[in-house]
């Protein structure tokens, strides 16, 4: 077994013995979370949003069995007008944002304003799929949950947290039964 250090990014998948028909994916992004802050010179509130978007893309990518790319995007009229996280099936992750340099807002709703939230699955082979929901929830996790409830066939919930130094998330999904 490999020993994990606090600086590593870790994504794990689980099937639950005590909850048959459920799948859990957990993620901790420490190295990636710090790189976003260090290399992109973002304000802390934008970095936290990017870290959560990175988590969402990582969790989704590791929940599906496919080869290709998962893209999670928020486009809005707020001071943070664009958030995009792309995660490939081989674990490559890229996240970017566009924000107003005079940014002073701190709450999610004040940062993003109104717009749309999109999840795109772009498989290497097969058809591209995109689901879009309005950007009217109170967090990235809530936007993801709104997407799951409107666009997906499986009951799924996601929780995300980021503090600028590390980020963690959990996705719980009820699998289809026959």
Residue ranges and their predicted role:
Residues 2-178:
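Interaction interfaces in information-processing and related assembly proteins
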């Amino acid at each position: 077994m490999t020993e994990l250090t606090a600086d590593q990014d870790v994504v794990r998948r689980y099937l639950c013995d005590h909850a048959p028909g459920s799948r859990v994916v957990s993620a901790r992004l420490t190295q990636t979370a710090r790189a976003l802050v260090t290399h992109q010179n973002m304000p802390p509130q934008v970095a936290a949003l990017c870290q959560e978007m990175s988590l969402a893309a990582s969790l989704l990518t590791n929940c599906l069995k496919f080869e290709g790319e998962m893209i999670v995007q928020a486009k809005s009229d707020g001071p943070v007008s664009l958030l995009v996280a792309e995660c490939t099936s081989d674990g490559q992750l890229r996240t970017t944002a566009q924000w107003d340099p005079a940014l002073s807002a701190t709450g999610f709703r004040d940062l993003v304003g109104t717009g749309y939230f999109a999840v795109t699955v772009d498989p290497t082979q097969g058809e591209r799929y995109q689901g879009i929901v309005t950007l009217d929830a109170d967090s990235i996790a809530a936007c993801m949950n709104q997407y799951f409830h409107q666009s997906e066939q499986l009951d799924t919930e996601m929780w995300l947290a980021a503090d600028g130094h590390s980020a963690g998330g959990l996705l719980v999904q009820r699998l289809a039964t026959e």
